């Protein structure tokens, strides 16, 4: 019986609260709606770039603390003629943030410092935008959620002051940002370009970093060219620290500057970029492009990519993986530079690499392949001054090689090189003469013999460093010591060089 009375009392109390809330809604909502309309109109008038701002009606829900504007139209003075419209714009804010908008309540609800939630969500439906003779587009839906900011910046904005941009960004938090079905047409000097974006997604913007960014079904087209990407994604993006970011933004690489001034700016920027790229936490953890394509004005101008991916997990210790799958380029891309590739319409690249720290050195393994040319596999251990690449030529030249092994399987590369000689029928003697000239001395006898086997019947060429002792990079290419430093062996292929040439270019 006692529990039944408790349940009954709770039910009655809940009903009363609901009735009170409904009563408050009926009284307060019209007041808030009128006030919001006045504030929005007043704000639009204060912003010099806005010429006109209007909406058909305003709705306020005190229970959800959401404000909804219908049929929004904004016309800008600058850029001239820019128009934006939305069928519906809804803004939902936390109770504290809503109270901060009331000057008499602000001292009691707005803290002196620290992070505070300023917006639960903002959603916009049926967005369109245009500039006469330049731009026209639409966006089906956009939403932003979980926005937080430093209380100092909230106070500054409410007082009409503009916070310093980097400081504002450093303390801002956005849980999510989504956009669906963006379409735009841009007028150019030679015609028009159409762009579409199926979806955009951002997750976890905080501490000058972004946890996830996705662009899906991104396409662009003109009257003669088309390009598209099924997916562009980035995880774990980290911008430079606030101090470095301010310095980078202060440097303006203006095309009107003199070459001397530009060189000075670049010299100022490069060390900061090196510091950003070589920090313990990489600037981006994952970068990926999937299903990219390009089609030019001519039928042969076709390029495509199935996958390109970078996994940059750490700089200290070094850990990185890269992959390229089916990068296809037209053969005419290299033929236009004088290289003749009979019977070949496309160049198809594939490759993978795995780089990681191993006993204080960097171990790199992987392969590169070009269809109908050959495949190279490698496994090398090396060290660089400082232990981390700083993307400088001096550091690259100062690196030392410990152990290294390379294996190349010929699938037509040598035959194509021979076919591009002045007299292809004399390619064999020419190769032998070039080997005798390039690798003289008795120390290179075994190396020359192996290379001559390979050029006579292209098959597999294996090159292995004979010692694991650290060797300066430049010394690895010293002709006088190549034969002692590298062991070269060749496995003959099934066809001779001339048989390959006849198969690749039978009409020669």
Question: Where would I find each of the regions flagged by the language model?
Answer:
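Glycine-rich, small/hydroxylated-residue low-complexity segments
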Residues: 6-11, 23-508
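Short, Lys/Arg-rich N-terminal segment immediately upstream of the first membrane anchor
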Residues: 1-5
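Low-complexity, highly charged intrinsically disordered N-terminal segments
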Residues: 16-23
